Amino acid sequence: ARYSDDEMREIAQNVSVFARVSPEQKLKLVKALQTEGEIVAMTGDGVNDAPALKQSNIGVAMGKVGTDVAKDAADIILMDDNFATIEAAVEEGRCVFDNLMKFIIWTLPVSLGESLVLLAAIFAGTEIPVSPLQILWINLAQTVCLGFAFAVENKEPNIMVRPPRKPSAPIVPRAFVYRIILVSAIMMAACFYMFDRSLKGGESMAVAQTTVVNVIVFIQIFYMFNCR
């Protein structure tokens, strides 16, 4: 049967299984779902699947039985022709995205806090609580070593239960922006407090700056566990 574009969009939203679908109908189904804002993945192995594979957001061709035309039109080639591999790939991709977001949420307030410490000291005309060499050491050694832990973080238990993330959604939600600002402000206040206390306690400038470095490192470690 021939359907209009509006009818095809309604059918695509309400029907789960289609059988004996022609190449033209496959292409129409993909376009109908995309019009409704869906991210469409299409699997295929034959020449007749090429248009729909090309149109879909993620075209997946079979590696063993797939034709060269289908492989050229696809974005991904499924080497073992096992559909369970697609689920495993989605799961791994969500895990990578989660860990990347955790790292961003962790490293942004740390870097912003260090910048606020330096800027506040410059504008206030006081001694710099942490030297440029110490900042370099924190960023190159401490941050890299601690940040590597997020790369090997295990996936969340509900990772495949969650609904798909909207492509238009920001990487860092607005709620986390306020959290980043709060942690940065706490870090800046803690650094200045310990720096001032060390100097008033009769410690040298080197000891006071070392104290600030330790404060930054301990805040990084504590906040890292919080981000997990």
Where are the language model's segments positioned?
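Basic, alpha-helical nucleic-acid-binding regions used in initiation and control of genome expression
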Residues: 53
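Membrane-embedded transport module
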Residues: 1-42, 56, 61-228
